[in-house]
From Swiss-Prot:
Domain of life: Bacteria
A GO molecular function held by the record: glucosamine-6-phosphate deaminase activity
Organism: Staphylococcus aureus (strain bovine RF122 / ET3-1)
Gene responsible for this protein: nagB
This protein's record includes keyword Zinc: no
Catalysis: reaction(s): alpha-D-glucosamine 6-phosphate + H2O = beta-D-fructose 6-phosphate + NH4(+)
Name recorded for this polypeptide: Glucosamine-6-phosphate deaminase
Lineage: Bacteria, Bacillati, Bacillota, Bacilli, Bacillales
Amino acid sequence: MKVLNLGSKKQASFYVACELYKEMAFNQHCKLGLATGGTMTDLYEQLVKLLNKNQLNVDNVSTFNLDEYVGLTASHPQSYHYYMDAMLFKQYPYFNRKNIHIPNGDADDMNAEASKYNDVLEQQGQRDIQILGIGENGHIGFNEPGTPFDSVTHIVDLTESTIKANSRYFENEDDVPKQAISMGLANILQAKRIILLAFGEKKRAAITHLLNQEISVDVPATLLHKHPNVEIYLDDEACPKNVAKIHVDEMD
């Protein structure tokens, strides 16, 4: 597991955007696992700049989002469909829509939708890179504490802490969906390479637990210790004291 403090959200996001760009440039049929939320805004902004500057052919790139709120239509401003369109797919409108995969949070039968999305993941095979954030309680995707390590795509009851943390995106806390559809922990670990981003003081405790705690369902992110190729990029505020700062221009 590689852990790097790149000083700021902007610097870390730029570095990871370059990694995604290089993957798409050198592997035009690559499969990318994507994440959403406040952590990822600079990442997509930087990635869009790189894509527009170089007019990269992404017609054969496939994307797979981690999760979606249950009960929100794709057109809802707080849905992750809407987020991905606003942050990436409308900013660089050359991704092939048939290769964009995001769970449907407004399906009539959500358990059937979870099974359907899991089938897509299995049929498409390993993602080349999986992008992750981390919740204040150590969740990855929407896999809350207590989620079995062998879980696949499923419907999640969101914890009070997750609802409270996400309420800043809604008019009030009561508007935050109480459930989500999420890749399971087993799905996440199927990726060839995992890149986790964490920014801000509120994420420091979760990162500290991830790095120092034994593998436990109480902190789902600790499962990443079982994966052979994990990279964690932090800013100063999220970084535990024992992780040294490094500048992007010092990296390979």
